[in-house]
């Protein structure tokens, strides 16, 4: 099978995507597929460079990659691809929309408000949410332009920074607890990982620098494990996920809260999904093979 590994892109996460793509290529080649590296530098590249491939493995992150646009183009071209479809991808990229659906489905998530203008910040609403808060681009990823703000004085500057990366900014209550991530493969949860950043939170450096955080497989207390698994599965169903996603949560006083869903989780040597799969004996090559297999089974 001729597999095109699509990477790069035009988002702020381009370098992360290129790293994912290189790792994916290295291990897919072990499976004896014909691999075509496809580096995206501009939007039109998808139409031009994807011609002639049998399957697209998406190693993209961020806008024009994780937001359903590339998925829509590939569907138009009748090229099967890895991961979730356009609708789920678009919704999960929009943190505000994701949280609205979670709230509607009675799935725990931290309180938040969104703003589109640094001059129209509702400080009373933020006060009700309670400080400290995270201020971040609504559709951003990899914690780019994400700041922990501890009082009213720091809000405007953080909002202005986030607006440089997105037209909408989320201000979300900082729920202090243990950060965990649940990797879902074909609707089943792999072992839970605890994320223990060396910084105050799991920022860009903690995510991608060697030694930026400790990510360890943990065995949750039985009752909590059941709650977490049920919540991850509810997210999968409510947001109509397919093939694989990563559900990030915070556990506070025994109660899990969903932070966000990643429809194209990172695939670098530091990535969480391969670590979780490895804990049940699934090698990186086997994981990639499963993603290709399950993706081909999805009716688009």
Swiss-Prot record:
Cofactor remark from the record: Binds 2 magnesium or manganese ions per subunit.
InterPro entries: ATP-grasp (IPR011761), ATP_grasp_subdomain_1 (IPR013815), D-Ala_lig_Van_CS (IPR000291), D_ala_D_ala (IPR005905), Dala_Dala_lig_C (IPR011095), Dala_Dala_lig_N (IPR011127), PreATP-grasp_dom_sf (IPR016185)
Function in brief: Cell wall formation.
Matches recorded under PANTHER family: D-ALANINE--D-ALANINE LIGASE, D-ALANINE--D-ALANINE LIGASE B
Biological processes per GO annotation: cell wall organization; peptidoglycan biosynthetic process; regulation of cell shape
Residues annotated to bind Mg(2+) 2: 260, 262
UniProt subcellular location: Cytoplasm
Binding-site list for ATP: 126-181
Coiled-coil regions, chain positions: none
Required co-factors: Mg(2+); Mn(2+)
Gene designation per UniProt: ddl
Keyword Metal-binding assigned: yes
Pathway this chain belongs to: Cell wall biogenesis; peptidoglycan biosynthesis
Catalyzed reactions: 2 D-alanine + ATP = D-alanyl-D-alanine + ADP + phosphate + H(+)
Pfam families per the UniProt record, alphabetical: Dala_Dala_lig_C (PF07478), Dala_Dala_lig_N (PF01820)
ATP-grasp domain mapped to chain residues: 99-293
SUPFAM superfamilies in alphabetical order: Glutathione synthetase ATP-binding domain-like (SSF56059), PreATP-grasp domain (SSF52440)
Ligand binding (Mg(2+) 1): 248, 260
Magnesium keyword on record: yes
Enzyme class, first EC level, given as a word: ligase
GO molecular function: ATP binding; D-alanine-D-alanine ligase activity; metal ion binding
Name of the molecule in the record: D-alanine--D-alanine ligase
Keywords: ATP-binding, Cell shape, Cell wall biogenesis/degradation, Cytoplasm, Ligase, Magnesium, Manganese, Metal-binding, Nucleotide-binding, Peptidoglycan synthesis
EC number: 6.3.2.4
GO CC, any one term: cytoplasm
């Amino acid at each position: 099978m001729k597999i095109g590994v699509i990477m790069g892109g035009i988002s702020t996460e381009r370098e992360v995507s290129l790293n994912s793509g290189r790792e994916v290529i290295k291990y897919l080649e072990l499976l004896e597929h014909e691999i075509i590296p496809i580096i995206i530098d501009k939007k039109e590249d998808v139409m031009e460079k994807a011609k002639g491939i049998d399957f697209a493995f998406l190693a993209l992150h961020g806008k024009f990659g994780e937001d359903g646009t590339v998925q829509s183009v590939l569907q138009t071209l009748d090229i099967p691809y890895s991961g979730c479809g356009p609708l789920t991808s678009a919704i999960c990229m929009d943190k505000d929309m994701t949280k609205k659906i979670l709230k509607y489905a009675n799935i725990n998530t931290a309180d938040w408000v969104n703003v589109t203008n640094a001059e129209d910040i509702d400080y009373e609403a933020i006060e009700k949410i309670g400080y400290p808060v995270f201020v971040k681009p609504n559709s951003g990823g990899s914690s780019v332009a994400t700041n922990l703000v501890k009082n009213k004085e720091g809000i405007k500057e953080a909002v202005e920074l986030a607006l440089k990366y997105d037209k909408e900014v989320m201000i979300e209550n900082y729920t202090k607890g243990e950060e965990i991530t649940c990797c879902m493969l074909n609707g089943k949860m792999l072992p839970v990982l605890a994320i223990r950043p060396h910084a105050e939170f799991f920022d860009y450096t903690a995510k991608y620098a060697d030694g930026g955080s400790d990510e360890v497989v943990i065995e949750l207390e039985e009752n909590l494990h059941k709650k977490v698994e049920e919540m991850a599965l509810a997210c999968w169903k409510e947001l109509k996920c397919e093939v694989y996603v990563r559900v990030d949560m915070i556990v506070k006083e025994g109660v899990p809260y969903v932070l966000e869903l990643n429809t194209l989780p990172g695939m670098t040597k530091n990535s969480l999904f391969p670590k979780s799969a490895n804990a049940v004996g699934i090698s990186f090559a086997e994981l990639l093979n499963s993603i290709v297999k399950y993706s081909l089974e999805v009716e688009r």
